[in-house]
A protein has these predicted regions:
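Accessory DNA-engaging acidic/polar modules
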Residues: 1-65
C-alpha cells in the first residue's frame, strides 16, 4: 500500500504493518480499534497472523482489495 507495507511474519506468527513515516493520530486509532498493537522490537504495528488479521488490516488501512 502507498506509504508502507504489510508483512506476514510467519516466524513470529504476526501480521505486521510497517509505515514509511509515523502514522497520524487517526490512523493509529484505527489500527488500535482493529486489534493492532505497536511493537518497538519490530518497528511495526502487529497482531497475531490469522485470516481475520488480514481483513482487519485492510479495514484499518481503508483498502478494498
Amino acid at each position: 500500500f502507498p506509504g508502507g507495507e504489510i508483512v506476514r511474519n510467519t516466524e513470529a506468527d504476526r501480521l505486521q504493518i510497517i509505515f514509511d513515516e509515523k502514522p497520524d493520530d487517526e490512523q493509529r486509532e484505527a489500527l488500535k480499534q482493529n486489534g493492532f498493537r505497536w511493537s518497538p522490537r519490530y518497528g511495526a504495528w502487529q497482531r497475531q497472523l490469522t485470516r481475520n488479521a488480514e481483513i482487519a488490516a485492510r479495514r484499518a488501512l481503508g483498502l478494498t482489495e
